[in-house]
Amino acid sequence: MLEEPRPRPPPSGLAGLLFLALCSRALSNEILGLKLPGEPPLTANTVCLTLSGLSKRQLGLCLRNPDVTASALQGLHIAVHECQHQLRDQRWNCSALEGGGRLPHHSAILKRGFRESAFSFSMLAAGVMHAVATACSLGKLVSCGCGWKGSGEQDRLRAKLLQLQALSRGKSFPHSLPSPGPGSSPSPGPQDTWEWGGCNHDMDFGEKFSRDFLDSREAPRDIQARMRIHNNRVGRQVVTENLKRKCKCHGTSGSCQFKTCWRAAPEFRAVGAALRERLGRAIFIDTHNRNSGAFQPRLRPRRLSGELVYFEKSPDFCERDPTMGSPGTRGRACNKTSRLLDGCGSLCCGRGHNVLRQTRVERCHCRFHWCCYVLCDECKVTEWVNVCK
C-alpha cells in the first residue's frame, strides 16, 4: 500500500472566478475573483467588466442589471455543485465545468451534443432561474420583488387577518371593513384554514432572465444551438414543476388558527434529482444538420417538450480528451466492492487501482449567502482510498 498525503487543490474555474468558497470562518465576498470586504455595492465594474467570455448581448444585460447578473452567476456556481453531486459516480462527473476560469459554457463538452451536454445545459439554466427568483423574494434585487398578486387577493388577506385579530380579542368582526361588491368573493371566515399571502418567489422574472442571459448565445438555425435552447427550457420547466407551498401560522399563543401561504422555489437538490432522472431517458435525435435546425425525425412536440435531447453518442470518458471535455478517470476515487458505476472495475476502465492513504483539507458545512460568497468550515480528513490508475 502506498501512503501519500494529497491536500485538496483550491477550487478553480467558476468556483475560483466567482465565489471561491472560504476554507475558514472568515467572511469574504468574492465576485469574479475579486476579494471585497463585507457586502460591497454590486456595480457594473465589480460584476461585468472583470468577467471574460460574455457575449455582447450578455455584457449589455449585465451592465443594465449588475445585481441580477451577480445572482445569475451564483446560480451557475450552485448548478455546477449540484451537477457534481448528481453525477458523482459517473466517469464524467461535471468537474470539467469548473475549469478554464470562465463561464461553464466555455467548457468543451458544452460545444458537443452528448447526453452529458444536455444535462449540463439544463442544470445551468435551472440554476440561474432558481437563484434569481430566490434573490427577488429576499428583496435583494432592484428590478424585481415578490411575485405579483392582485389587489383583490391582498384585500381578502387583509380582511382575514383583521378578522382573526378581532376574534382573538373577543370582539366581533370589525364593521369598518368594506363589504364585497357584486360578483366579489365573499369575505373569508375564521374557519378557513389558509389563504395565499406572503411573498411569492417571482419565478417569471427568474425564468425570463435565465432565458435572456443564456439563450442569447444561440444561433437560431443551428442544430446544436436548438438542442441547447431546448435543454435550457427543460431545466427551467423542472424548477416550475417543483414549486413548493410554504406557510406561516397566525393565531394567539402560538396557535395556528390561520395560515398565509406562498409559492417558493424548490430545494435545488430536488431540481437536480428530477433532471438526473430525465438524463436517464434522454431522447437521441438523429439529425442531418443542414442549418435548418430541425430535429429529425420530427417527433411529437408533446413528447419532446419535457425531455432532454442530444444528437451525439457519448464517448466512454475513460481517458483525458480536452476536445470532448473529458478529464478522464485517472486519480478518481472508486469503490472496490461495488459492481455499479462507482466500482473500480467500471470507473477505472480496466486499468486497475491503487490504495492510498490521503490527508486532505476540504470545505465542509458550506452555506451559500447572497451575494456572492460561500461561507465554509475547514475540515481535515485522513482516510484510505482506492484510486484509479
UniProtKB/Swiss-Prot annotation:
Predominant cellular place of this UniProt entry's protein: secreted
Location of this chain's protein in the cell: Secreted, Extracellular space, Extracellular matrix; Secreted
Matches recorded under PROSITE patterns: WNT1 (PS00246)
Region annotation Disordered: where it falls in the sequence: 171-197
Documented effect of changing residue 211 to Q: In STHAG8; reduced activation of Wnt signaling; reduced endothelial differentiation
Alphabetized Pfam families for the sequence: wnt
Gene Ontology molecular function: cytokine activity; frizzled binding; receptor ligand activity
Signal peptide span: 1-28
Post-translational modification: Palmitoleoylation is required for efficient binding to frizzled receptors. Depalmitoleoylation leads to Wnt signaling pathway inhibition.
GO biological process entries: bone trabecula formation; canonical Wnt signaling pathway; cell fate commitment; cellular response to cAMP; cellular response to parathyroid hormone stimulus; cellular response to retinoic acid; chondrocyte differentiation; epithelial cell differentiation
Expression across tissues: Detected in most adult tissues. Highest levels were found in heart and skeletal muscle. Low levels are found in brain.
Residue positions the entry lists as glycosylated: 93, 335
GO cellular component assignments: extracellular region; extracellular space
Keyword entries, A-Z: Developmental protein, Disease variant, Disulfide bond, Extracellular matrix, Glycoprotein, Lipoprotein, Phosphoprotein, Secreted, Signal, Wnt signaling pathway
Modified residues (Phosphothreonine): 46
Intrachain disulfide bonds: 83-94, 136-144, 146-199, 247-261, 249-256, 318-349, 334-344, 348-388, 364-379, 366-376, 371-372
Residues anchoring lipid (O-palmitoleoyl serine): 253
Compositional bias annotation for Pro residues: 177-189
InterPro entries: Wnt (IPR005817), Wnt10 (IPR013302), Wnt_C (IPR043158), Wnt_CS (IPR018161)
Oligomer and partners: Forms a soluble 1:1 complex with AFM; this prevents oligomerization and is required for prolonged biological activity. The complex with AFM may represent the physiological form in body fluids.
Role: Member of the Wnt ligand gene family that encodes for secreted proteins, which activate the Wnt signaling cascade. Specifically activates canonical Wnt/beta-catenin signaling and thus triggers beta-catenin/LEF/TCF-mediated transcriptional programs. Involved in signaling networks controlling stemness, pluripotency and cell fate decisions. Acts in the immune system, mammary gland, adipose tissue, bone and skin.
Family: Belongs to the Wnt family.
PANTHER family assigned: PROTEIN WNT-10B, WNT RELATED
Disease: Split-hand/foot malformation 6: A limb malformation involving the central rays of the autopod and presenting with syndactyly, median clefts of the hands and feet, and aplasia and/or hypoplasia of the phalanges, metacarpals, and metatarsals. Some patients have been found to have intellectual disability, ectodermal and craniofacial findings, and orofacial clefting. Tooth agenesis, selective, 8: A form of selective tooth agenesis, a common anomaly characterized by the congenital absence of one or more teeth. Selective tooth agenesis without associated systemic disorders has sometimes been divided into 2 types: oligodontia, defined as agenesis of 6 or more permanent teeth, and hypodontia, defined as agenesis of less than 6 teeth. The number in both cases does not include absence of third molars (wisdom teeth). STHAG8 inheritance is autosomal dominant.
Protein name listed in UniProt: Protein Wnt-10b
Organism per entry: Homo sapiens (Human)
